[in-house]
Amino acid sequence: MAKDKKTNPESKKSFPTAFFFLLFGVIFGVVTVQNFFSAKKASVGFSHQLEHLVNLKLLIPEESRKTALNDNLVSFSGRFREVVPAEGQVRYQYLDLIERKHQIDFELEEASKSLTVLSKEVRNAITWFSAISGMPIPEAGYTISPRTDVGLSVLEPLVVYGPVDAQIVNLAALENRVRSLPKSTESLRVFGSDLYALIGKYLSPALGIGSESLKKEIKDLHQQVENSLTQVIEGDQAVALYKTVLETLHRISLALVSPEEGTRFHQLRSVRLYREDFNRCVKLLRESDETQVQLDKLRGELVQAVWYFNNQELSSRALEKQDPEVFSRWFEGAKQEWAAFSSNKSLSFRAPDQPRNLVLEKTFRSEEPTPHYSGYLFTFMPIILVLLFIYFIFSRQVKGMNGSAMSFGKSPARLLAKGQNKVTFADVAGIEEAKEELVEIVDFLKNPTKFTSLGGRIPKGILLIGAPGTGKTLIAKAVAGEADRPFFSIAGSDFVEMFVGVGASRIRDMFEQAKRNAPCIIFIDEIDAVGRHRGAGIGGGHDEREQTLNQLLVEMDGFGTNEGVILMAATNRPDVLDKALLRPGRFDRRVVVNLPDIKGRFEILAVHAKRIKLDPTVDLMAVARSTPGASGADLENLLNEAALLAARKDRTAVTAVEVAEARDKVLYGKERRSLEMDAQEKKTTAYHESGHAIVGLCVEHSDPVDKVTIIPRGLSLGATHFLPEKNKLSYWKKELYDQLAVLMGGRAAEQIFLGDVSSGAQQDIAQATKIVRSMICEWGMSDHLGTVAYDEHSEAAPTGYGSYHEKNYSEETAKVIDNELKTLLDAAYQRALDIINSHKEELELMTQMLIEFETLDSKDVKEIMDHSWDADKKRARMKEEGMLYKKISEDLPPPPPQENVQDGTSLKFNTST
């Protein structure tokens, strides 16, 4: 019975999953039905649309109803016809004709205004022509357009009258003067100036010749006269020229006066434009008469018609007299409703809460309002269902793991019970000092009385400090596994929630659970999420995170040594932790988990290599030496990548080739073989990397060259890898000078062999500059500046932001530092040039081999330097490495039978391995 009482409430609290599927189905069904009904409605929603629908007879009158809501608003409904009746088509044609008539009248009015303006321009142009040509206007005048009768309308003629202005120097006067023109220079100059001015008047906009051929001919005459005025021409030659020009002008004048296409002065722009507008007016008048005839005919058919226009009831004649602009805007709505009829036909519509108008009062039948409960149901049901769904989801979240709302403040720490933790110190390698620090904790958990009997106090808290991936969490689990005690694990971010007080409640609950399972270990990973400095946040020291931290401080200082609870925490940001959290009595011991050295990396690789099938020839010590700065997680990932690469190549064991490739992938990035590099780019990269390798092999204090490659990885097009022989604990001056020469080797090789330099040495120059600046300003290795530290770096601020660089020396000292910096870099570059000049043959050979093989290992580089290089041996070695541990397919087909065919030949097959 006790078991039933315990389990039945849990079964009642669990909500059936089928309910949620049913809930989603109901919501989907309601929305679908609403969309179905709304999609079948016609697009009528405003009362002003009804004027056009009623005028064009598009609605069924018997189904047009309205329901009064108050004195101003009504709801109306109706249905469209299946086809437009004949009367509706006649009505629409009538409205369209009225709109066309208004448009024609407007265009005709604009054309008439244009004719008035152009007629004035024509008179001015012809009068000006008569004045400059000396040709008098006839008494009857020049007729540009005759009187024209178009139906009942008349277009008045355009006749130009006017006397000639005798004061203007004209063509006729110059023709008379040239007959008795003296041949003196002054007389010729005066006559030429008058002729030049006359030709300019022919080209003036006042005349406005529109023919391009005539204008070009007149411009040529203008240029000839201008040349005669600027050049020295004999008298007879000048007179002959002027006579020719006058004859040409006379001919042009006669051509302008001569009728063309039935019109004089047709070559003038103003006359041509006038004729175009005149013809346009004639055309518009004819269209107006035709439209008026059609309107009269349709008006006879619609004598009894009633039109609803802007809330007015009008006859057909009254509709025609409406303002054209107002009618045009109103007719746009009629056109839209007429065009929409094809999609609205046979459909019903309903529009609620619309203002009353005349068409509703006259044509729609009134009815009493009826309640639509189904409409209310469809309207509010989706809202109710969504609110219910949100309520149930929220209630399930609040219930948490234990099925009650009060469990929201319970600790989410995961308990690894006694006997379940299989991790021991045997699984931890490379951090021996940290393991030694934690041996006492293991002894306490196994035998607490050993320490308390002597009056000693066991550390209440242990803080593991180290970079990411160094094994802080792993060593904490190893402590619990070695002592075989319960292990509570939780992340620092699990304490902070959106509800106030939840974090502090979880802290209290976690320590209560730990006391019940004492002796045990509580491990808080990434404690900096909850243990940051107080008072630095936006909440001014009173936010939820700080309340959680306060509760943690109280709990850590509140339990005694006899309770057997040890708190372990891990962080990679000890600088941001609150000082009260770090004081003795809370975290008594700080264990620094450093990045492993060469020996540590070898031990870590050996631990992870136990579960990987490695080729016995794989040198784990060489891998450890080639991965400086790698954490335990990096090394584990390296071996895992090597195993994946070997499996991809169908090998039965992981060889040194896969390990080296995985190391490069983890540390430097994946090969970018898809990057297109032309032959010149490959050659440049090969010279650059060969320069690094040659200088590195020739200097005394450089690490051995491990590999040279021109395969792009990450952001680099190539790389030269060095294999450190020992841990780098300090830097020596001679070593740094050699390292600077190695860094400058790539740029020096480009300068010597290519005669130019590229941007590929950007990282080399930046790294060399950083080293030299540290030598001068931090390590006191400059002969000129002495053993003085010129750079200061501040400690990290309490807010958690990084340190900053402070300059505390004068501008003159800065100049000396810059000069010394340039001197050392120039010396390193010159040293690299000297080394490469003395090993040109080896560098050229290494470059050629890099272009062919793309990668050279340490053995290849040594053979090139020893002049014992053999490319065939390299190819054979690469082929042997490629076939090493290759899987042999078990599904090979049997060999084909050797049967003779009719022509006496045997069947032969190509085989490949």
From Swiss-Prot:
EC identifiers of the protein: 3.4.24.-
Gene: ftsH
Positions with biased composition (Polar residues): 899-913
Superkingdom, taxonomy of origin: Bacteria
Molecular function terms, GO-annotated: ATP binding; ATP hydrolysis activity; ATP-dependent peptidase activity; metalloendopeptidase activity; zinc ion binding
Cellular compartments per GO CC: plasma membrane
Binding annotation for ATP: 466-473
Protein name (database record): ATP-dependent zinc metalloprotease FtsH
Record flagged with keyword Transport: no
Listed cofactors: Zn(2+)
Organism taxonomic ancestry: Bacteria, Pseudomonadati, Chlamydiota, Chlamydiia, Chlamydiales
Subunit structure: Homohexamer.
Record-linked CDD domains: RecA-like_FtsH
The organism of origin for this protein: Chlamydia trachomatis serovar L2 (strain ATCC VR-902B / DSM 19102 / 434/Bu)
